[in-house]
From Swiss-Prot:
Annotated region (Reductase), positions in chain: 149-402
Positions annotated to bind heme b: 85
Residues that bind NADP(+): 274-279
Cofactor binding description: Binds 1 heme b (iron(II)-protoporphyrin IX) group per subunit. Binds 1 FAD per subunit.
CDD domains, A to Z: flavohem_like_fad_nad_binding
Official protein name in the record: Flavohemoprotein
Record-marked site positions (Influences the redox potential of the prosthetic heme and FAD groups): 84, 394
Length: 402
């Protein structure tokens, strides 16, 4: 437990961190990765070069300082971070390295304002946060290892099938190279996949949602969008262009806290933009495989027909099951696109226009897609009277709807 004096000192830095947080985190990453270059393989170099990683850490540090009197407010964020750390193979010993460079960066960036007393206070606060994360991650590692077919760290998987789903998205069916079993997982969870990127001279990890329902014997499926640019798209480009059937990938055990509550029986509305449909398809397939009779709505946004993935599969489920209804939005409708078959609505997703279809009593709403898409749907759901605790969200990327 932190003393009142320590909490007061840390909290007093929150305004400074909000103003100068990115300068601090840029300095921190340069310092830490310069002194520990092996850690570059843990970090998404695309996010490093775009500044996204620095922005995210700056926001997290400022939020921790602001809520130091009641860090329980941040527990949902801590849970999400812990799942990602386990997926990446972050271990307890890494926290000492981070702490060393974070405290040194605070001193070097804040200068005379970083008194010994302030550094000691931040050391105590960081220690509290590190202990919380280490404890939760230890439990997640143990759970991953104890499942039938489970493991920790990286495991070799062979690509047994590679299937294009659209002009931009390709599915990879992965089976353990050792011939062993694969573990069960929750619909909505993801794995990390690690590949060598020659242009960077590094192994690089990325997280990809499992896009099939749990229970596919001896296999896992990920569906990967080819991202543009370098280095942001280097891993997806490597998977699309260089990885073929028979090749081997490093894969982490399934993790993630964005998961379907399949047992409560409430109606489910699945809202996705672009490649954000991948966890939604896992959820939809899980529910329909169980012959779950609850009302299910599948709302999806994409730019145009060429990038519309898994269309035939979704259409078949909706045609066969009266409790499943779809609403597909195309931003650009082509001359050959058929309303009711290829798409249902033109333009961007407008929940107000389809409120009678998607606003269901006591429903749970699952959202996944680019950040602007997510923000727009959250606002619309709030305007339509959906309670905040009924909205469950996962953010994919930072760009537009794919």
């Amino acid at each position: 437990m932190l003393s009142p004096e320590v909490r007061a000192l840390v909290k007093a830095t929150a305004p400074v961190l909000k103003e100068h947080g990115e300068a601090l985190t840029r300095h921190f990453y340069t310092r830490m990765l310069g002194g520990n270059p092996e850690l570059r393989q843990l970090f998404n170099q695309g996010h490093q070069q775009s500044g996204q990683q620095q922005q995210a850490l700056a926001a997290a540090v400022a939020a921790y300082a602001e809520h130091i009197d009641d860090p329980s407010v941040l527990l949902p964020v801590v849970e999400r971070i812990a799942h990602k750390h386990v997926s990446l193979g972050v271990r307890a010993e890494h926290y000492a390295i981070v702490g060393k460079h974070l405290l040194a960066s605070i001193r070097e960036v804040l200068g005379e304002a970083a008194t010994d007393e302030l550094i000691d206070a931040w050391a105590a606060a960081y220690g509290q946060l590190a202990d919380l994360l280490i404890g939760r991650e230890r439990a997640l590692y143990a759970a991953a290892a104890s499942r039938d077919g489970g493991w920790t760290g990286w495991r070799a998987f062979k690509v047994v099938r590679k299937t294009p789903e659209s002009a931009e998205i390709t599915s990879f069916y992965l089976a353990p190279a050792d011939g062993g079993a694969t573990p069960d997982y929750l619909p909505g969870q993801y794995v990390s996949v690690r590949v060598y990127v020659p242009e960077l001279g590094l192994m690089q990890p990325r997280q990809y949602s499992l896009s099939e329902a749990p229970g596919m014997p001896g296999q896992l499926r990920i569906s990967v969008k080819r991202e543009a640019g370098s280095p942001a798209g280097m891993v997806s480009g490597t998977l699309h262009n260089r990885i073929n059937e028979g090749d081997v990938l490093d894969v982490s055990p399934p993790q993630g806290d964005f998961t379907l509550d399949a047992e409560d029986g409430r109606p489910v509305v699945l809202l996705s933009g672009g490649v954000g449909l991948t966890p939604m398809v896992s959820m939809l397939n899980h529910l329909t495989a169980r012959d779950d009779g609850r009302q299910i709505r599948f709302v999806h946004a994409c730019r145009e027909a060429g990038v519309h993935a898994m269309k035939e599969h979704i259409n078949a489920l909706a045609a066969k099951r009266p409790n499943v209804r779809k609403a597909v939005f195309y931003e650009r409708v082509g001359a050959d696109d058929r309303r009711g078959v290829d798409y249902d609505y033109e333009g961007r997703v407008d929940l107000h226009a389809i409120r009678d279809e998607v606003i269901l009593p006591d429903a749970d709403y699952y959202l996944c897609g680019p950040l602007p898409f997510m923000q727009a749907q959250r606002r619309a759901l709030a305007d339509l009277g959906v309670a905040e605790h009924r909205i469950h969200a996962e953010v994919f990327g930072t760009g537009g709807v794919a």
